[in-house]
């Protein structure tokens, strides 16, 4: 699946393309996509394909196409403090983006069939927490991953506000998936080759909406153990945060408010995102394929005055861009204001590092 939008040269350009094509429609979803670089979840030798709107699979590792994840994130209608269950959590890319929206008082659980992929997801999560500035820009709900078949979840597990299944669900398993959902909750899953959004409006009442046609690998059926019994999957416990952890969250939140107020007093409008210098895009001739009598005829579509506001306008646009953008212009490296503020506080170093989650940068 995928290929609905043009490839980007970096993560931001990919997101720009998804916005332009209306796959990303809300600010919260856009912020989450920009905060986590899709390439970080690829193996090193395959990163050149990270910004294409294509699914990627290597062994048991799998990522859906960006346009699919965009539709899923929008359909889930995520809000801070909700509980989320990701069935087939894979690399943890989607779970981490969801965690940026859920905030510190949400619940973020994932079930993955393959133990090697669960380990891969934990490594990627650790890398994100240790190295990404986005961790300090958001209040993060850290995902917890367990290994097992998502069709064997223990029947006494808690229900969730939001559930996503990343594998094709057959009609026979629809009721099972619905049973994982709280009243008022939303379930998004590929059901009979349609990405489907199901909202639980009452104990036995549901609203169903078909979003788009998709092609997902089907759920793998459970295998019985040697004893003939299924292996029940125990989801992570719904643990209450310690007082110490709650204090850290509160202190970090207060510091962020101070930073924002200082920026308002200085600039009048708070912190601004670092400007992104976009590469100038070359206007390429688009190719249209016409299928006629089983033969493909390729017609070159060349820009003309009626198509492209005349070549004179393009030349003027080019000159203006060159005049306003220095040839060696590069965006300034982002500043982690929270980290700088914490390190400047008159506190013992161990407390500073605790407030920073012992992050490397």
From Swiss-Prot:
InterPro entries: PCMT (IPR000682), SAM-dependent_MTases_sf (IPR029063). Keywords: Cytoplasm, Lipoprotein, Myristate. It is found in: Cytoplasm. Residues 85-94, 160-164, 181-191 are annotated as: AdoMet binding motif. Transmembrane segments: none annotated. The keyword NADP does not apply. One of its GO terms (biological process) is protein modification process. One of its GO terms (cellular component) is cytoplasm. Coiled coil: none annotated. GO terms for molecular function: protein-L-isoaspartate (D-aspartate) O-methyltransferase activity. Residues 303-335 are annotated as: Disordered. A lipid is attached at residue 2 (N-myristoyl glycine). Residues 240-250 are annotated as: BC-box. Pfam families: PCMT. Residues 345-348 are annotated as: CUL-box. May act as a substrate recognition component of an ECS (Elongin BC-CUL5-SOCS-box protein) E3 ubiquitin ligase complex which mediates the ubiquitination and subsequent proteasomal degradation of target proteins. May bind to the methyltransferase cofactor S-adenosylmethionine (AdoMet) via the N-terminal AdoMet binding motif, but probably does not display methyltransferase activity. Belongs to the methyltransferase superfamily. L-isoaspartyl/D-aspartyl protein methyltransferase family. At its N-terminus, contains L-isoaspartate and S-adenosylmethionine (AdoMet) binding motifs. Also contains an extended SOCS box motif, where the Cul-box is separated from the BC-box by ~90 residues, within its C-terminus. This is Protein-L-isoaspartate O-methyltransferase domain-containing protein 2. It comes from Bos taurus (Bovine).
């Amino acid at each position: 699946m995928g290929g609905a939008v043009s490839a980007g040269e970096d993560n931001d350009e990919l997101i720009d393309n998804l916005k332009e094509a209306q796959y990303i429609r809300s600010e919260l979803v856009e912020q989450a996509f920009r905060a986590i670089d899709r390439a970080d979840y690829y193996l090193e030798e395959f990163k050149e394909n990270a910004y294409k709107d294509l699914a990627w699979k290597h062994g048991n590792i799998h990522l859906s196409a960006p346009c699919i994840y965009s539709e899923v994130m929008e359909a889930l209608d995520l809000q801070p403090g909700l509980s989320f269950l990701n069935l087939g959590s894979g690399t943890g890319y989607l779970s981490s983006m969801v965690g940026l929206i859920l905030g510190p008082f949400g619940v973020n659980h994932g079930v993955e069939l393959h133990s090697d992929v669960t380990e891969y997801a934990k490594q990627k999560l650790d890398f994100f927490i240790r190295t990404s500035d986005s961790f300090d820009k958001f209040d993060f709900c850290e995902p917890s991953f367990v290994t097992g078949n998502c069709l064997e979840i223990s029947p006494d597990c808690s229900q969730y506000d939001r559930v996503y299944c990343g594998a094709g669900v057959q009609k026979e398993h629809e009721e099972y998936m619905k049973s994982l959902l709280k009243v008022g909750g939303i379930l998004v899953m590929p059901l009979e080759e349609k990405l489907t959004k199901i909202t639980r409006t009452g104990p036995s009442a549901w609203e169903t909406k078909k979003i788009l046609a998709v092609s997902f690998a089907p759920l793998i059926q459970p295998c019985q153990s040697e004893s003939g019994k299924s292996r029940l999957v125990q989801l992570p416990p719904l643990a209450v945060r310690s007082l110490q952890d709650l204090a850290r969250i509160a202190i970090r939140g207060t510091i962020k408010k101070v930073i924002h107020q200082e920026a308002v007093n200085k600039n009048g409008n708070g912190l601004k995102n670092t400007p992104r210098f976009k590469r100038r895009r070359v206007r390429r001739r688009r190719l249209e394929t016409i299928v006629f009598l089983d033969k493909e005829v390729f017609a070159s579509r060349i820009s003309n005055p009626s198509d492209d506001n005349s070549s004179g306008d393009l030349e003027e646009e080019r000159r203006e861009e060159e005049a306003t953008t220095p040839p060696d212009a590069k965006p300034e490296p982002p500043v982690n204001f929270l980290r700088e503020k914490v390190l400047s506080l008159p506190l013992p170093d161990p407390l500073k590092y605790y407030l920073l989650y012992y992050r490397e940068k």
